[in-house]
């Protein structure tokens, strides 16, 4: 199963970007053992529209243009469900076992996702009630992807 991240905005070079690449590298090297394959980190340019509504609409259209047919879409959203690392790993495993070819995990821009994207989502995921800077959300996501693989393979990185 291919796993991709679609993120609105560009990540600047620095410690945060290095950490994202660190976890993506670990995920990529470990994921084939449990039937996953990291496909792409697709950056979608932020809209420069004057209002939040217009920006979310434009970014949502761009995101949808990149979605593969019949993919499962996990959307990071403050209104989403907060789950444990184990439950996140189970959800990915469920998609894999269903025979899903592509899972896309979408991170919105500063204004979040529009209603169309939230309605298209197969799963709305939240990293808690706090608001996280985009760079930190990317780090959290990539670490949790790596952790999901270690859970699925009973690797000691994730201790119960």
UniProtKB/Swiss-Prot annotation:
One of its GO terms (cellular component) is cytoplasm. Its EC number is 2.1.1.177. InterPro entries: Alpha/beta_knot_MTases, RlmH-like, tRNA_m1G_MTases_N. The keyword Lyase does not apply. Its main location: cytoplasm. The keyword rRNA processing applies. It catalyses: pseudouridine(1915) in 23S rRNA + S-adenosyl-L-methionine = N(3)-methylpseudouridine(1915) in 23S rRNA + S-adenosyl-L-homocysteine + H(+). Keywords: Cytoplasm, Methyltransferase, rRNA processing, S-adenosyl-L-methionine, Transferase. S-adenosyl-L-methionine binds at residues 76, 108, 127-132. It is found in: Cytoplasm. GO terms for molecular function: rRNA (pseudouridine-N3-)-methyltransferase activity. Belongs to the RNA methyltransferase RlmH family. NCBIfam families: PRK00103.2-3 (NF000989). Specifically methylates the pseudouridine at position 1915 (m3Psi1915) in 23S rRNA. Homodimer. This is Ribosomal RNA large subunit methyltransferase H. It comes from Bartonella henselae (strain ATCC 49882 / DSM 28221 / CCUG 30454 / Houston 1).
């Amino acid at each position: 199963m291919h796993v991709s991240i679609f993120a609105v905005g560009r990540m600047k070079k620095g410690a945060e970007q290095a950490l994202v690449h660190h976890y993506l590298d670990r995920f990529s090297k470990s994921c084939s053992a449990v039937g996953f394959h990291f496909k792409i980190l697709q950056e979608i340019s932020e809209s420069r529209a004057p209002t939040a509504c217009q920006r979310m609409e434009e970014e949502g259209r761009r995101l949808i243009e990149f979605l593969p047919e019949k993919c499962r879409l996990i959307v990071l959203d403050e209104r989403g469900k907060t789950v444990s690392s184990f439950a996140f790993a189970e959800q990915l495993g469920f998609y894999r076992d269903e025979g899903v070819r592509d899972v896309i995990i979408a991170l919105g821009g500063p204004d979040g996702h529009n209603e169309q994207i939230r309605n298209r989502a197969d799963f709305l995921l939240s990293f808690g009630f706090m608001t996280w800077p985009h760079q930190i959300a990317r780090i959290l996501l990539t670490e949790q992807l790596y952790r999901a693989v270690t859970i699925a393979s009973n690797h000691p990185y994730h201790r119960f």
